[in-house]
Amino acid sequence: MNRIQQIQYLIQVLLQEMPAYQEQARAFPQDELSQWRLLRSLMNVRPPMPLDPSFLAAQDALLSAEREEKGVVEADTLPERPGHPGIAVWQGDITRLKADAIVDADNDRLLGCFVPCHGCIDNAIHSAAGLQLRDECSRLMEQQGRPEPTGQAKLTGGYNLPARYV
């Protein structure tokens, strides 16, 4: 299956789960970039729910290839700040950073941004990690039984990110 076929397979699965978006989806052009934006949009609006293993395998293959195309930045190779051993400052796409953990500026529900293709860091992280991140966050919040207080954090898997944890 080539890239456009992977994207279209994932779109079809998501549209079966969320048929309310079928008419809007038909308006998207068939080129790869437009179909990628449609896929990301559907992933952004998908509420947490069980994930089909065949969908996850296809999603993970696509997101892994995307990660490799963007390139990975090794956190342990970044230059340290003069006079501050062990501290490095890096500015760039956080979804490329291979580190033990990255920090997401999420909301108190920890479910990620639901605005399709929004430019916020929360959307970028959830989009690059895959739907497993929203699913894990949903389970954590359900167990907690209340919104996450400001300044607090939860640790989740990084899934398709180069970082091990978010």
Model feature map: region roles:
Residues 1-166:
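Macrodomain-like recognition of ADP-ribose-binding/processing modules
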